[in-house]
Amino acid sequence: MSKPFKLNSAFKPSGDQPEAIRRLEEGLEDGLAHQTLLGVTGSGKTFTIANVIADLQRPTMVLAPNKTLAAQLYGEMKEFFPENAVEYFVSYYDYYQPEAYVPSSDTFIEKDASVNEHIEQMRLSATKAMLERRDVVVVASVSAIYGLGDPDLYLKMMLHLTVGMIIDQRAILRRLAELQYARNDQAFQRGTFRVRGEVIDIFPAESDDIALRVELFDEEVERLSLFDPLTGQIVSTIPRFTIYPKTHYVTPRERIVQAMEEIKEELAARRKVLLENNKLLEEQRLTQRTQFDLEMMNELGYCSGIENYSRFLSGRGPGEPPPTLFDYLPADGLLVVDESHVTIPQIGGMYRGDRARKETLVEYGFRLPSALDNRPLKFEEFEALAPQTIYVSATPGNYELEKSGGDVVDQVVRPTGLLDPIIEVRPVATQVDDLLSEIRQRAAINERVLVTTLTKRMAEDLTEYLEEHGERVRYLHSDIDTVERMEIIRDLRLGEFDVLVGINLLREGLDMPEVSLVAILDADKEGFLRSERSLIQTIGRAARNVNGKAILYGDKITPSMAKAIGETERRREKQQKYNEEHGITPQGLNKKVVDILALGQNIAKTKAKGRGKSRPIVEPDNVPMDMSPKALQQKIHELEGLMMQHAQNLEFEEAAQIRDQLHQLRELFIAAS
């Protein structure tokens, strides 16, 4: 099933890319465990990594610091490798409240979660691809270091069907039930099967648009065919098919029976300890909860919160690392850590927070001590499991630099010839008035401005001040959710307003070629918001515009400012020299505005949660100008229905696009009436 990686791109590597690709590939072939790619904003870091993957033909996992950047990378990799398996693995919770106990108020908070079915399907598809093929790129968030089902047990549970095999229909149904598939003859959806005479239709858990039909004749598999579950149309007939479990946490019956005995032993030992310490309430609570879980496991093969018994189910010893996505990656796999200066500290912090919450649950009799082993990886375990690694960042952290032995692969020259912004330092005393005049200059020539402040209060006051002086300004703060944030960024790019004020939200991975000025207020106040890395990242937001400029307002030049200015000037010098030698004139990026909202276009545009295929979206600017009022009214009614459908499918970006078009249509309707 595997194919060789085939890179699809109209561009050839240019600028610093060919040298970066050569050095990274040499390092990997020489067996270097750690390498760092220092790639400035807009230098094509993803393209460089895609070239390395295609040249070396190795399965790869790309770690991103959050879902938004993971979706952006997934979209880019999908374009680079349309014929290969590009998969997406992030947390499938839309909402997650872990179980917790607050001793001070004697409050127990039950686990409460809302699972996004579409992302669950993509996670299952990712592990299936990792087990079946070598031409796989999995883009994952830090969710990859959390416990997952053991790959060995997962493989043992698979159901293989081949044409001509002798198998009883009831045996197939029993095996499907063990894989946690549910029979549903009415609503045929992901993770279910239906039976009609000697025909069994199975909707694989990892698929979103293809189902399997098994036709039996007297205990023999006569035909296997793939069909569209929506239309029932046969797509192809196949000689064999493998059905994977519905969940990563599925376990063979004999392993469950063995695990139950081990759980009973631990329960007896723990009860003894609690009674010796006169903790009668905790002992009774633990006994009641564990006995209930054991009965559920005995009857159904699983229970709510079964992940708390994962140590027994995977057969691992106390304190051993849980099985994670890394266990599914082949031994010669490659790990790419994107925005490593953010991702690496995140990995280090996950274990400690999880541990503190679970210790309270164990102490007060809500969980057995073995629940502590259902956890994310410790940092040292992550280091031990990680294959050959490339850290990618515009501002690598000390950890990455130390691991790479100070030998950093530089990717400073952009293929477009764009230079790093010019930096100016100006006094704090007149910063607001000076900023106002700079904003007016930029707004007059249809360019945008980003302003970063130190405090929420200052951001609010500045926004109010700029509004009073007639500027079109918005404030981006931490209470805004991801989708709304993307809408604000899109509106900035479309020119709905000229200035965006924020605190710490203007750093990694924001693509805005229209921004020609970044203003950093109180740049001389040392701290994490004004550290060398933060300053370089923020300055980089203006690096996608030909007229890019950064103004740092400060009365003195701090060590962080000096380093950030020095590094930016070093890069600018190198870029200028390259441009002169090769006769390159810097060109602004002409990135379509919809691109930023198509972060994970392949995620949103696939079939949404079994509700039928998403309908194509009409571009907001394709509004017919010569429609009659009646036709406009009909069009508005149609689009309102489509907008609600997208919102229901959680495709908020598409819904927002239609909302903008509706706004234009309503204005036309009023004018025409």
Swiss-Prot record:
Domain of life: Bacteria
Induction: Induced 1.5-fold by hydroxyurea.
Keywords: ATP-binding, Cytoplasm, DNA damage, DNA excision, DNA repair, Excision nuclease, Nucleotide-binding, SOS response
Cleavage, annotated site positions: 630-631
Subcellular localization, as worded in the UniProt entry: Cytoplasm
Record SMART domains: DEXDc, HELICc
A Pfam family that the UniProt record links to this protein: ResIII
Family note: Belongs to the UvrB family.
Domain remarks in the Swiss-Prot or TrEMBL record: The beta-hairpin motif is involved in DNA binding.
Protein name, UniProt field: UvrABC system protein B
